[in-house]
Regions:
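N-terminal catalytic or cofactor-binding beta/alpha core of small enzyme domains
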Residues: 1-130, 134, 147, 154-158, ...
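C-terminal folded domains that constitute the principal catalytic or ligand-binding module
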Residues: 137-138
Length: 437
């Protein structure tokens, strides 16, 4: 891959980064630099936000603009972002025009910045803003902010130089983002902790003005496959309007938890599983565990009573148990697990057995159980308020104490939890239960 670094003679931060890039490249040494890349440098007189068509001056595959970030908050920061204007062109470029984003490389650089970040600095995306936009090649800005002190800081310049030279793209899922402040906090966190890589990101204040044409442009210029919305950053009206446009344009929408739980599935396979889940239960979310490889996928039902009892007994333990299984679990929009799992078509019998075994193991460890052939009998013992009243126990703290398994003293008598409890049985038929250890 051919990479062109673009800087301005007007800019101290760009000069700082350029100096350290040249030093590192002149020093050689391939132990930490990403292999298979060549580099060239372009220096211009104008501010980079006005450097339209800069990619026409170089034989390159990627444009990385090195520049300063200025902010009234004066926070020491290292940032990446792609350029474009959702509305007017107040800072270069043209109105309603977006530049092509180097989405995967931008995420790789962000993650590398987090690794090399000097003490006292933070790293983040910035939302899409300013020019240039007249570019045919993928591009992004990497910046040092936010004052002259940081722009000329050798540690910051070296960190950025090391980061862009060592950045490695790692199976990203390209996304567009909506909502948040200038520093796109949620999108930054997602990109640092998952495969989610953002191209164009629209600030909260831009969302109300977006139309379907601009959303399609965000997708196309980012090479994105889905969208993420920072729901807490939008008011209800803007959220509903945006959600409607995404639905109309057929753009998949992912929640943060879905992005974090995609596993290593290729997007096409993940999307196929998502569509399968939606046919099982409209709007169902999916969470990938150790499902890998290729081949047809199929839904596998699990006894809903068995699953429900396992979840009530120990939901975190059940989730941990799924981690090693080649399955996807389904959940409702409010994150209640559904009694259907997705796995490879040729794994169904093994997965049914594994899921049954996991449920039974958890229930037996937490509940009073008995086994009769293929029947699992769960005995539920509960505090019975009526029995407590018959023993003269007044409602209130004594009820709570007995329900918590502690005896109480009433008029010199000890009332134990067993005296005021009732039991009931739940019987579940599980084929092959006698063979479970």
């Amino acid at each position: 891959m051919k990479v062109a670094f673009v800087s301005s003679r007007q800019d101290k931060a760009g000069g700082n980064i350029r100096h350290h890039l040249m030093q590192l490249l002149d020093a050689g040494g391939s132990s930490w630099q990403e292999q298979g890349r060549t580099y060239e440098f372009i220096e211009v007189d104008e501010r980079l936000i006005h450097a339209e068509g800069i990619d026409k001056r170089a034989d390159t595959d990627l444009i990385i603009s090195i520049w300063r970030h200025a902010s009234v908050t004066t926070v020491p920061v290292l940032t990446v972002h792609v350029t474009g204007n959702f509305r007017e062109a107040d800072l270069g470029g043209t109105p309603r025009t977006l530049a092509p984003a180097a989405t995967a490389m931008m995420q790789a650089t962000l993650r590398s910045l987090a690794k090399h970040c000097p003490e006292g600095y933070r790293v983040s995306y910035e939302v899409t803003h300013h020019g240039p936009v007249d570019l045919a090649l993928p591009s992004f800005f990497v910046e040092i902010g936010s004052t002259d002190k940081e722009w000329t800081d050798p540690a910051a310049g070296l960190a950025v130089a090391q980061s862009v030279l060592s950045a490695v793209m790692q199976d990203p899922v390209p996304l567009i983002g909506f909502g948040g402040t200038h520093y796109a906090a949620r999108q930054t966190e997602i990109a640092l902790t998952s495969r989610g890589a953002f191209g164009h990101i629209a600030h909260t204040r831009e969302v109300a003005m977006l139309d379907e044409a601009m959303i399609r442009a965000m997708m196309a210029k980012s090479g994105a496959v889905a969208a993420y919305i920072d729901r807490k950053a939008l008011n209800r009206e803007d959220l509903n309007r945006l959600s409607g446009m995404l639905a109309t344009t057929g753009i998949p929408r992912l929640t943060e938890s879905e992005i974090l739980s995609m596993g290593h599935l290729p997007w096409e396979r993940y999307h196929a599983a998502r569509e399968m889940a939606d046919r099982v239960s409209a709007g169902a979310r999916i969470y990938v565990h150790d499902l890998q490889g290729t081949g047809p996928l199929t839904p596998v039902p699990l006894d809903p009573v068995l699953l429900g009892e396992a979840i009530k007994a120990d939901e975190p333990g059940f989730i941990r148990g799924l981690a090693a299984l080649p399955v996807i679990h389904l959940a409702t929009q409010d994150n209640h697990m559904l009694p259907v799992f997705i796995t490879h078509d040729d794994h169904t019998s093994q997965i049914i057995n594994a899921l049954n075994t996991l449920c039974v193991k958890i229930i037996r460890s937490k509940e009073i159980t008995a086994t009769e052939k293929d029947l699992l009998i769960i005995t539920k013992v509960r505090f019975d308020p009526e029995k407590a009243r018959e023993f003269g126990v007044p409602a209130g703290p004594f009820f709570k104490q007995l329900a918590g398994g502690q005896p109480v003293e009433i008029d010199g008598r000890t009332i134990t939890p067993g005296m005021v409890s009732s039991s009931s049985d739940i019987t579940i038929h599980i084929p092959g239960l006698e063979k479970f250890s």
